[in-house]
UniProtKB/Swiss-Prot annotation:
Note on cofactor: Binds 1 Fe(2+) ion per subunit.
Record-linked Gene3D superfamilies: 3.30.420.40
EC supergroup of this enzyme: transferase
Main function: Required for the formation of a threonylcarbamoyl group on adenosine at position 37 (t(6)A37) in tRNAs that read codons beginning with adenine. Is involved in the transfer of the threonylcarbamoyl moiety of threonylcarbamoyl-AMP (TC-AMP) to the N6 group of A37, together with TsaE and TsaB. TsaD likely plays a direct catalytic role in this reaction.
Name this polypeptide is given: tRNA N6-adenosine threonylcarbamoyltransferase
Keyword tags: Acyltransferase, Cytoplasm, Iron, Metal-binding, Transferase, tRNA processing
Organism of derivation: Ehrlichia chaffeensis (strain ATCC CRL-10679 / Arkansas)
Amino acid sequence: MDKLKIVLGIETSCDETAVAIVNSNKEVLSHKILSQQEHAAYGGVVPEIASRAHINYLYELVGSCIEESQLCFNDIDAIAVTAGPGLIGGLIVGIMMAKAISSVTGKPIIEINHLEAHALIIRMFYEIDFPFLLLIMSGGHCQFLVAYDVRCYYKLGSSLDDSLGEVFDKVARMLNLGYPGGPIIEEKSLLGDSGSFTLPRALTNRPGCDFSFSGLKTAVRNIIAGQKCINHELVCNISASFQDCVGDILVNRINNAIVMSKDIDHRINKLVVTGGVAANKLLRNRMSVCANDNGFEILYPPSKLCTDNGVMIGWAGIENLAKGYVSNLNFFPRARWPLENLRFDILRK
């Protein structure tokens, strides 16, 4: 029997400061996360504020996690840390903390691709083998990939402009709903009429599974600009129309992505949807019906682990460690780090 592995995961790629300790038995031994409320006043993440908050709180969260788990650093088998993609300032804070712990304890360090952590967290909760179809929807990314193995992905399509999470945040800002926008728009949409406004469903008449959301964002802005009064009813109707439009786009693109994935590998029969937008219950319902109609099983992480967290970084560390993938101390933060490039990074090392 393989020895139980324990990994400390550190996540500081955006505005969540998160630390977790997980083991290879798929147990969360401790998990601490601090979301920064200061960004709400700006309608989005301010990199300088985010990085300073990571500096202020990360050391305390690491110590709190160690204490809660009733372990010591000698019990940890490796330290996993987000190295990208993300905001450089925040990434530097997390990486320097992880490198310091690794240097002092002599424990291996593993640089984690943030997107891969979103992709692999599903395997902590479901027995799902490779390959599978993957849809990542977050504040910075919206893309379909085929996941063949740890650090081995093939991109099928992605957003040509804005990410879906970014559009949710910007629409919420236009409506003065605050940040983050996704949960608020979902809540308001339940009270509105989705047929109130006709919005563009870009690329849905074209093959492939790329996305384009910039036209949708502009259309919402134009609707708002044409109103004399923005009352609660209007906010709810715009939210409902916007979310219904997003649902139609996702269904169309999923239909195409399923066909494309089956053409690539006939074994693929599961769709994993992850990232912050995957927590949206209304969109989950639309996507689930679509996948089931295509004979695919669709899987989502627990809603609280769709957004950025330390558990997914720790689990990605477990998966990488099992493959023998560890890093030296010379790696650097990356603002951009395409998931499909991971296999080439292995070859270079």
